[in-house]
């Protein structure tokens, strides 16, 4: 009995404190870096306010300025791509992805709900598919819009470095700077996006090749009483 150690012994208290601290730190590290963001409901105000970046794979491109994103926290370091696979079927991906609405850019409207298609709408869709479909991208979520889409900046690695997807759309003229004041998000890039648009317009790239016949997506949606 003489060798027994009280639970109040300094060494016991120190070990207990260290163990508790390790659990607390580990839990917070898991929540911040390892927990999957499955849907927009998992995006906490802290994530949006701090503009925390998320890494994942583009699983579907359904329009010229949005896509489905499967979050893969930790990337290759946590086994994604070799130990852990991203689902491929629509049923397996149900309720497991974020719908991303690219920030700061508006693509020409495709034909739906009885509305005619804008020129370059299919080109914009094909461009985005070629640029990001099946690739891993980094998103910076800014907000959630009225359609439950995550308005975000998206960046993807290319041979020439990391590219801002919105900027590249504007640069090539298959997207224009977002015009609506409702839900507009640019991060810190609005002036950059506008300078890229001015150059695309000067060089008559993409939609700007239409000259006076060109109607922006924002103007087009106003004509058909549908705002986004």
From Swiss-Prot:
Enzyme Commission identifier(s): 3.1.-.-
GO molecular-function terms, A-Z: endonuclease activity; metal ion binding
Transmembrane segments: 13-30
GO CC annotations, alphabetized: membrane; mitochondrion
Pfam annotation, one family: SNase
Residue span(s) of domain TNase-like: 52-210
Lipid bilayer topology: Single-pass membrane protein
Origin: domain of life: Eukaryota
Keyword flag Hydrolase: yes
Active site: 101, 109, 149
Subcellular location: Mitochondrion; Membrane
Keywords for the protein's UniProt record, in alphabetical order: Calcium, Endonuclease, Hydrolase, Membrane, Metal-binding, Mitochondrion, Nuclease, Transmembrane, Transmembrane helix
Main location: mitochondrion
KW DNA repair (keyword) present: no
Residues annotated for Ca(2+) binding in this entry: 106
Annotated family: Belongs to the LCL3 family.
Protein name: Probable endonuclease LCL3
Classification of source organism: Eukaryota, Fungi, Dikarya, Ascomycota, Saccharomycotina
Gene name of the encoded protein: LCL3
